[in-house]
Every structure is written in C-alpha cells, then in structure tokens.
C-alpha cells in the first residue's frame, strides 16, 4: 500500500492508480510518484475511478481482503471497475495452510476471514465472475492467490482450471468441508497448549531462562490461548525498534 508493487507496472509504461484508506501511506505513495486515493475501496469509489480513468485491465489486492468485513462489497467494486477482458488478482490467507500447518495464531482481530477455493468459486459465480487460475504462496505461513475474470469474457490461462480443481480436491481431502474437522482441530490445539505449558514449566524448574523470539500480533493470540505469562517467559526480543522497550498487550511481558 506504499506503491511498491504499482511502481513495477509504472516502470513498464502502464498507467497505475492506488487506493488505500491509510492517509499517511496514500500521501507517501503519491509523493513518490504513485497516485493513490486515500479511500476505502468500494463500488462508489470504483465507479468514480472508471468514470475518470477508464476501466482497469488489472486489479491487484494482496493481503487486504482479510481486513475488510464486507467481501461482497469488494466484489461489487471490482465489477464496477474491471474491464471485460481484465483480471482481478488477489492474495488471502489460505485455510488449507492455516489448518494443515496448525497456524491458529494467525487468526486474530485484523484477520476477519480465511478462504478456500470451493466457496470462493460459488461466490464469484453468483456475481457473474469466475476463478480462472490459482496459485499458492508461502507468505504469512501460506497464502492463496486467485485470478478472477468475467464469466463470459475472462481470458484463458493455460493450466488454470486444472489448478483450480486440484486445490478443490485437496481441500475436500483435508476435510475442510466438514465442521467436525475443526472441532477436532480445536481439541488438538488445546492439547498442544497443555504440552507446551508442561515443557516450559519443566525447563523453568530446572533453572532455564526462557525467552520469546519475535513479537508479532499473532504472539498475543498464542500467549492468551495457551495462557503464557511472565512466569513462563522472561522477555521477548524483536528487531523492530517500534516494539522494543515495551510490554505485550495484557500479559505485560
């Protein structure tokens, strides 16, 4: 959202425009040469862009949809702006990775949803859109990259539909379409917490000093869900100077 990605497109000679509600970042991006509207992306803003600049051949939205409660509102905005032959590419946290890797700590207040292909495909179909390709990324533990176009006029990407079906089958095989899978996962997570607490307490009793490595937001999720306190961790280190010399939320480590 600081214009880094769009700069590459601009360097290739394309017209670019950013949209981000963080006014300080939008201002910085604009000053660096990437015009960025300090707005929330929605249908109204999308229609204004289409009116003033024309429809977009490419719309990118990387790791921002999870921060927005109204996913269908995003889709309405994309429909108002996307050219009939255009492609919308977005990245979101992939539930298959979150589940298979046990990344429950990435589920916190800023991440209101995680996605799988099967329900996304049905959602887009109801809006006259379709997924034409998918990919996976290791960013933030595992991300899903979707390529979406209009149902009737989307470009064809070689191997795209095969990739879509492959992930749909993988999701079903992992049991992600079954609620019982997540009840079992919850029990497994809680058991892991009990084992971790026992391990830390045992180390402390033997005279060990235990330090936390890294202070991301997900660390707070982990500490609260596993009830880790000052008695368990002496302190936490992080190379981000903005976090140094402070304490963790609530636990005050």
Residue ranges and their predicted role:
Residues 30-32, 201-253:
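A solvent-exposed beta-alpha-beta segment
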Residues 88-113, 117-120, 124:
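Short, glycine-/aromatic-enriched active-site segment of Class I SAM-dependent methyltransferases
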Residues 2-45, 231-246:
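Class I SAM-dependent methyltransferase SAM/SAH-binding core
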Residues 57-60:
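A conserved beta-strand element that flanks and buttresses the S-adenosyl-L-methionine
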Residues 129-140:
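Conserved S-adenosyl-L-methionine
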Residues 44-54:
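Short amphipathic alpha-helix with an adjacent loop that forms part of the alpha/beta core around
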Residues 72-89:
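A short glycine-rich, Lys/Arg-flanked "PGG" loop and its adjoining helix->strand segment in the class I
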Residues 140-188:
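Flexible, glycine-/basic-rich loop-and-beta segments that form/coincide
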